[in-house]
Amino acid sequence: MNNNFCIGLDLGQASDYTALAVVEKLEGNGASSSRNCIALHLRHLERYPLRTPYPEIAERVAALMRSDVLTVSTTNDLLQEIRVPPELVIDQTGVGAPVADLLRERDLIFRSVVITGGDKVNREGRVYRVPKRDLVSALEVSLQTGVLKAAEGLELWPALRQEM
């Protein structure tokens, strides 16, 4: 069983905020049926105060990953309960590499994205090197087609829209 929640973590530096987003992937009745398209609903946005220590961020992310709110429980073929955490994707560009180590120390499994100025996506294990233009284009298309929607009342949504 898959978990339909995905947590995205963008790590900031001294004058740049660290931000976290929770997106729910909806399939079937809650999504468009064209070309296996899924609906993406932005459920939560969080911005950590400037200069929040990275170990504290790692602890908070680990707690969120293990929370009952975002974890799905199911049973395997042996009828044993299995807890499926949300998917975690981190921006490993810049300060992301040392923070990735902190997340691994907390036994978290995640995918890393390194944003590049290149022209093609490369994958090495769980690390994806993705051109910035591809990320921006995918975001713009998802917003314009209504595939990505923000939950009402997200306090940081207007600021995020302005920054895009």
Regions found by a protein language model. Name each.
Residues 1-114, 121, 126-129, 133, ...:
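RNase H-like, metal-dependent nuclease domains and their acidic two-metal-ion catalytic environment used
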